[in-house]
Structure formats: structure tokens, C-alpha cells
Amino acid sequence: MRAILLLFDSLNRHCLEPYGCGWTQTPNFSRLAQHSVMFDRCYAGSLPCMPARRELHTGRYNFLHRSWGPIEPFDDSMPELLKKSGVYTHLISDHQHYWEDGGATYHTRYNSWECVRGQEGDPWKAHVGAVELPPHLGQANKQDEVNRAYIRGLGKQPLEKVFGLAHEFLNENRDADNWLLHIEPFDPHEPFFAPEEYQNRYSGDYTGMRFDWPPYDHVTEPLAAQVHCRNQYGALLTMCDAYLGKLLDYMDVHRMWQDTMLIVATDHGFLLGEHGWWAKNRPLFYEELSHTPLFIWDPRTGVAGERRKALVQTIDLAPTLLSYFGVPIPPDMQGHDLQTVLQQDIPVRDAALFGMFGAHVCVTDGRWYICAQIDRAQRSMIIRCCRCISELCMHRKNCRN
């Protein structure tokens, strides 16, 4: 048994062609949908980045009792449980929080790992002298500016390196048995720094200041800048789609669909101006943030090109992978093995929790959701009830739920 887990960061469900979006170019996600079961009601659990990864490892909600932090010594970590049971686990990622204080110790649960440097403000390349930031809207920082100088050009982008290492692993190990390859690119997380090849596909007449790193705040920028920033996300998303396509090509050529599970998922979404907000964390956890894409191919069931309405979450991935490899699921895991859902659309839960420690707490049944939002100024809690539809997609005429 073999499995590939591909986890993107900030992958917007409502910006993917198979989920009904028409303004982005994501043909390989559409191709993936034909190769797998696509879930219509997948929700995040704990936001943002590292809380979501603790859920990926433990199959348990994190935000109810703890904020951002490392894997704990007492945690049942899915990759470590596989490792102890004789399944080789390998992580390839450019997600810099894995080697930061406060977010570390996740990667050490694998048999081996490879870390690609240079994303966001990763303290990677040294530059002792002054660093001049260009005129910009939104965010920018000096370390990121230094890093950008080293990741321009063919083959230098961290995303390219991550997938290059994934192909290296597959070339070396595709004929072996009992392994999990966890591929985790940081993209399309901000900053939206994509090569011109992809930017040109979303080209416009924007002539303003650089704007590829939105603030975690209300939208206040001119409309032209807002459109430009969304196009920058689209360009990076299309680059992610292209490298997903290379992985699908590899699986086609080497007939890996016969005996290799493929899971493609994300941790959460990202607001691109919907509801008057950029980014995440501060605003209400709208559908664009909490309602996530999920694709699973399971060679045991052989089901492909179908959709599922069952309500599923991030916490279901750990028990699903453990079950796939025949490893017992610890009783403290709150997630569900999704094999039965892949076979036929059987519900596994009536409601799903999601939120962030010390902030919003939300529950959904896949049709409605209730969110308890903290009003820090009034030291009170605001209860909101909303329909589970992405009503304010910025390109509403081209997107549907």
C-alpha cells in the first residue's frame, strides 16, 4: 500500500474550476476531480496554519484547548504511528513554520523530511546591508525582499523545488511498498509571488504599486489594486495547478493509480476582498475561509468522478490514512475513516466544529452555520447564523456553490 498526501496552503475552494469557478485557470484540478471523489461539504477545523497541522496529525480538534504550537510529546501523531508500524513516511515542504520556534517538531515525526527554504519571510539568505522596499500596498518585509532575489528564474521557486523533490522520491521509491509521501507546498499562501509566465495569463492594465501581499484587515485599497491582487492569487493558483498536473502525469505514466492513494487537501481558505476583508483570522470565518476543497482517490474502492455530500473535516484525514495502511486508529481520535463515504455517500457526522483558539467558534451542518464571534471592545460574544453559500464571490457571475 502506498499513499500521497498533497496539502496546499490557503487553497480557495471557490477559486477552483471543478467547484464552479470560471475566472481562474485550473484545468488539472478538473482533471483530478475525474480521477477521484470530490467532496462538496468539507470544512476546516482549527485555524490557521499550525493548529490545522496538529489536527492533520492527531485527528482531534486543536482550537478548543490550545492555540498555535508544536506537536506535544503525548500526541498520537499519524505519521509517527505509521512509522512505528513499518510504513515509511516522508515529508517535503517549503512551509517555513515547520522549523520555527512554536511550530516545530511536526517534521520529526516522519522517517525523513526535506525542507525547502525561501518562502514568505523565512530567514534564509543573509544580507547585512540596508534593504530598500519598493513602493507597495499591503504587506512587505525586508527578509522576504532578500529571498525574492534568489527565487526568480526557472526552477528556483520553492514550489518548483518541492515538486522536484517529490518526483525524486517517486523515482527512487515508486516500486517499493508501504510508504506515505506528504507533499506540502506553502503556495498559494501569500505573498502571491508567481513567475511572469503565470501572471501574464491574468494580465491587465494595472500600473499602480506592487500589491501581492494583502493585509489582515478591511479592504481599503482602490478597486484596480483589489482586482490586481486577486489576479496575483489567480496566477499563483494556476502555477500550483500546473505542478499538480505534473504529479498526475507521473501517476499516469507509471500506473500508480492501481495501488496508490492520493489525497489533495488544504488547511483553510483566504479572503480576497469578499465581505470587505482580506486574509483570515480577524473576520468572521465565512464560507470562503472554512469551506475547503477535498479530493480523494482510494484504489481499494476504485470510485472516481463522483461527488459526496457527506460532511467531512481535516480531522478525518489521519484515521483515513491509518485505516488505509491497516494501522489501528487510537480511541482519542475524533475524526472518521472516510472509506465508507468513498464507497457510497454515507453521513459520518451531523455537525462540524471549526474555529480559532480565543476567537471564533463555529458549528455547521453543511447547510447553515452558527458562529460565536468575540467582540473584544464590548467583552461580549456575538452570535451569527448564516447560510452556507459563498454569496459574495468577487466574480459571482462565473462562480457557483
Language-model segments: which ranges?
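Active-site-proximal N-terminal segment of extracellular/periplasmic enzymes that hydrolyze or transfer
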Residues: M1-V37, S46, K83
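Histidine-centered active-site microenvironments of extracellular/periplasmic hydrolases
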Residues: T24, P191-E197, R201-G204, Y250-E306, ...
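Catalytic-site neighborhoods of secreted/periplasmic enzymes
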Residues: E55-R152
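C-terminal, low-complexity/hydrophilic appendages and adjacent surface loops
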Residues: E287, F357-N401
